């Protein structure tokens, strides 16, 4: 549970809260985490229902009402026409998971994606 993990961090390391970026899985977790003193929060749609993930208007509205470090979503949604463009209206960084192919990563960055979760380390140097 996200809030329980955040509570444990807040209890054991209260002076380090500003160094953590807490990833919440549902909008209703935001206030619980923020009330513990965490200022850096990412909303990931990973555990939301498919219809909630696709409701870009609700996600943009949520981001307008709650300071976020970003919104994270599966790469499949980036392929949905208009999805990335709609979320860019939130004016927060967008992150996708999981993309390992460098060409796919570059294409996502061109779409406006700010960061990419990957299973790989740093890209190999180009010769």
Segments predicted by a language model, with ranges:
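Short loop-to-alpha-helix "cap/lid" segments that border enzyme active sites
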Residues: 1-127
């Amino acid at each position: 549970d996200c809030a329980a993990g955040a509570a444990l961090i807040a209890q054991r390391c209260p002076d380090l809260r500003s160094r953590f970026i807490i990833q919440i899985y549902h909008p209703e977790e935001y206030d619980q985490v923020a009330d513990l003193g965490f200022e850096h929060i990412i909303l990931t749609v990973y555990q939301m229902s498919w219809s909630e993930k696709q409701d870009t208007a609700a996600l943009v509205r949520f981001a307008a009402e709650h300071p976020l470090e970003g919104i994270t979503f599966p790469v499949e949604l980036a392929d949905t026409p208009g999805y990335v463009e709609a979320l860019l209206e939130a004016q927060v960084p967008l992150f996708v998971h999981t993309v390992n192919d460098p060409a796919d990563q570059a294409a996502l960055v061109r779409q406006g994606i700010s960061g990419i979760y990957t299973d790989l380390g740093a890209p190999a140097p180009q010769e």
